[in-house]
A protein has these predicted regions:
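Conserved acetyl-CoA-binding loop-helix of GNAT-fold acetyltransferases
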Residues: 62-70, 217-222, 226-243, 264
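N-terminal charged segments
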Residues: 1-75, 89
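Acyl-donor-binding surface of acyltransferase catalytic domains
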Residues: 59-142, 146, 150, 276-278
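Conserved GNAT acetyl-CoA-binding A-motif
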Residues: 76-86, 241-254
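A conserved beta-strand-loop-helix scaffold within acyl/acetyltransferase catalytic domains
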Residues: 157-221
Length: 283
């Protein structure tokens, strides 16, 4: 694992500690902190009910602390999720794995503060737009990741039909209504690449806190892939964050092919986050 510089480590650790509090309450279990949604169905950063070591408590985490957090997660009916910077709590992985949970690595990449972002071409007629709470494209943009990250996504014309179905789903299940206040409050920035008819082809988001942010949720409609849309959305999100006084912009990746895209935008390897296999993605 690549170790990041101490100042960068501190910025990212501070961010990870602060941003969930925009969406959740904190419950402390000794050196571990569990984030709990204050309202069912509310937007959440880190998945519903994830835990992380506190900055001061990281060296003191023990098996009993982990067991107490897991018991509370079961009581809440949420996944037994943990996420932390690897070098912030070096002994925690072994303890988590000894408790029977599978740990995954997610390498981080950071955009150097003064690194210019490249100008990326877009396909004819495609535009980039930051979506407001009342944007007519919002429901479809929130539905798109469910298709983009599906195990067996559709392709071709079937994409549009499935996106329409999922748009009705996220509207009906309260997702759209729950996200709107978050957008209005400035706790989330959602950006989409839109086809000429207004249908989102790719989306991504970031949540700002403490002068830092992590770009995530970058996904492309399967039939619109291989046109550079994910890179364009990522670059536009990074530029937007910088324009709004965010000076630490980073992201995580799971596949080397994705890391190569980020590297072409100027992102450079940093540290590593650890999380539990199968835990919910950030939203």
């Amino acid at each position: 694992m690549r170790r990041m510089s101490d100042p960068l480590h501190d910025r990212i650790q501070e961010y990870y500690a602060a941003v969930p509090l925009l969406f959740a309450a904190a419950e402390d279990f000794g050196p571990l902190r569990l984030f709990v949604r204050e309202e069912p169905g509310a937007p959440y950063y880190g998945g519903p009910g994830h835990a992380q070591p506190t900055r001061r408590g990281a060296p003191r985490v023990g098996a009993d602390d982990i067991a107490r957090v897991r018991a509370r997660q079961r009581e809440l009916g949420v996944p037994e999720a943990f996420e932390w910077l690897a070098d912030a709590a070096p002994a925690l992985r072994a303890l988590i794995e000894a408790a029977g949970l599978t740990v995954l690595e997610r390498p981080l990449m950071v955009l150097p503060a003064h690194r210019p972002l490249p100008a990326l071409p877009l396909p004819d007629g495609v535009t980039l737009r930051v979506l407001t709470a009342d944007d007519p494209a919002l429901p479809a943009a929130l539905a798109l990741p469910r298709l983009a990250f599906a195990q067996q996504p559709g392709t071709g014309p079937a994409d549009r039909a499935e996106l329409s179905r999922l748009t009705r789903e996220v509207t009906g299940d309260g997702t759209v209504a729950a996200v709107r206040p978050t957008l209005r409050a400035g706790h989330k920035t959602l950006l989409a690449a839109l086809a000429p008819d207004g249908v989102p082809l790719a989306v991504g988001h970031y949540h700002p806190a403490t002068g830092a942010t992590e770009i995530g949720g970058v996904g492309t409609l399967p039939s619109a892939r291989r046109q550079g849309l994910a890179a364009a959305v990522t670059a536009a999100l990074a530029a937007h964050a910088r324009e709004h006084d965010i000076d630490t912009v980073f992201l995580a990746y799971a596949q080397e092919s994705v890391a190569r895209i980020y590297a072409r935008l100027g992102f450079r390897p940093a540290g590593t986050t650890l999380l539990i296999a199968g835990q919910p993605a950030r939203s």
